[in-house]
Amino acid sequence: MAPTPKYTFTERAAAGNLSDAEILNSNNPTGSELPDESDVVVGGAGIHGLIYALHASKYKPNNLKISVIEKNTRPGYKIGESTLPIFYTWCKLHGISAAYLLRLFGLKDGLCFYFLDRENQGQYTDFCSVGAPGLVLASLQIERPMSELLFTILAQRNGVNVYHGREVDFKSTVVQGGGQGNKIAVSRGKYDSTPKTIDSALFVDATGRFRQFCSKKAPRHRFDGWNCNAFWGYFTAPKDESKIPFDLYEGDHTNHLCFPEGWVWVIRLPSWEGSLIANLMDMVTYILECADAGVPGDELPSSEELARMFGLKFQWVTSIGFAVRNDVKYPEDLSAYGTREAEQKFNYFVQKYELLQQFMSNFELIENLYGPGTTWFIRKTLAYQSPVVSGPGWLAIGDACGFTNPLYSPGINVGMSTSTWAAQLSHRIVEIGKSAPADAAESSIRKLLVPYDDYCKSLVPALEQMNRFNYVCYRDTRLGPQVACLWQFFAGIERYLSDVNIETFAHYAIKWVWGAMVPEYQQVAQKCIEHIETVPLDERLPDAMVDELLAFSNRIKSAAVAADDFSLRWDAILRSFDRSLNFVEGKTSRDIYTRQCSGCGAWLQLRPDWKKCHSCGLLGTEPQTAVTFDPPLTAEEEALLYAAWNTAPKYDPSKELKLPTPTRPAA
């Protein structure tokens, strides 16, 4: 039976006429006032700052006092909305499974790619990888204000203090090694400019691309050659997808529309924008109480029912954006395409490609979804790296360490390797600082962080090479699906996830990195980059070059498949490939793990125990909830699948961690 809904925060906010920051801070375990000392101070309550704090509190409960400082008065808008099974697995380790998460977020069932032919308008190829059966795993499309609010409340329930409306004063802050030597200056709020000083052993830079502390140690590094710019907006989410001009299109995928200059992301997700923060806090708290009580999925209120219960705004939207190379040559005058740069470049590419025009005719622009001036967004020169990610008394996590591109969503999903590993290391850092003289402590901490520094130093170039590999392959409709996507999933599919626990999660994440550090993957990636980059972007790749790269990739693939020590049902996971990862033109069969609600149009996981739409509450029939396995499972496969998702050996965290440093050809 579900708990009784409570309106604690709504009533508290009304009684005290509390601001957003005040009502959020009132939920801290030690209250709203900043502490005099804290083992760890985290700068930034974005997704990685909160993942760090939650992971540290769960890894060794009650061992560290953690204070998270966030300048915004409430969780606010950020781009980065698509997650992978690794993110869901981490959420599940923290007590929140799919039944509860899907009341707040959208379902994601794998990734689909459409490769547009620039020279033959209207023609395309595709690649599709499904997700996983709902009884085992899930993936989510998340609106960031909601994910950050969920993690804020969950962190507070785990003993972490999260202070909104407070800002680290980096000019006055003193960070030094050797134990408890940090003096973190924090503003008290809008109407009190006198900073409060917090004594701490460790400062964590979780300020994302702004790199507020990292930037003091070294300027950001830009990679040679072309970079990428992104421009995007928010659109309606059509219930009827039948008019979309791509075969077998489904809104439950993260859809990628790829072309020689870049690609478009298409992400269908729910938005709670416009809701009062106190009301949202009441709803999230209720969801967490339901999770604690183990309320079955079909006994939970749907998202629409929750919105009515707690007086919230709720709608489905579509995030659509371009991530395009910055060496593209645009017309000198773009005024015919709109009034702002983001709008102009967005519409320029829509009109350049016939299929993009047809596609966008199914969507209507939502103006100012996240407040005035938020109809169009643009971000330039996306890729960078922080040369220094730790030092005496501090370390960096997430995008503060570097970022490459939204393609394959590494920012959240791969970035979790830094935030969770740093969380585990922090316990040892603080222990060393308390148990040894300052100089000896700092020497030990420096040695402890060498592997972390080396990992971050190799991680971002590996992701940059991965990004460039995919981009250059998008220049041909054969290389996109048969080389880039094939290798991304063969090397990077998330194996062993069912065996990961809170102690081994970081080690798993460090080794995964979307397959970008797998030697065979790097071999194919470097070959493609070396060859394709010799051809100007506005020219078509020669057929002889494409044939050579296909043959090279297939040789490496065949050897890797033969040597692979585990079996996956590749013909069921990938739409156009057989079990040995051979491309099969015209093959459309695959497993089916989702269905679309006939009422609201939301995409739902197929599970025998879930007949209710998590979005609108409409009940389905038993046949509608059945998974289709194509090809059918053997008895052994069925037993293994429901036990562990795949037939791989158990994940062994004691395996030697090898971190090869990838090399990238000169631009």
From Swiss-Prot:
Gene3D superfamilies: FAD/NAD(P)-binding domain
Known EC number: 1.14.-.-
Annotated active site: 108
The protein's required cofactors: Zn(2+)
One MF annotation (Gene Ontology) recorded for this entry: monooxygenase activity
Uses described in the biotechnology field: Malbrancheamides have the ability to inhibit calmodulin, calmodulin-dependent phosphodiesterase (PDE1), and induce both endothelium-independent and endothelium-dependent relaxant effects, suggesting their potential as vasorelaxant agents.
Outcome recorded upon mutating residue 253 to A: Displays selectivity for producing the C-9-chlorinated malbrancheamide B but does not affect the selectivity for bromination
PANTHER family: FAD-BINDING DOMAIN-CONTAINING PROTEIN, FAD-BINDING PROTEIN
Protein family: Belongs to the flavin-dependent halogenase family.
Free-text comment about domains: The very flexible region (621-646) acts as a substrate channel lid, having two main open/closed conformations.
Protein name listed in UniProt: Flavin-dependent halogenase malA
Organism, scientific name: Malbranchea aurantiaca
Lineage of the organism: Eukaryota, Fungi, Dikarya, Ascomycota, Pezizomycotina
Gene field: malA
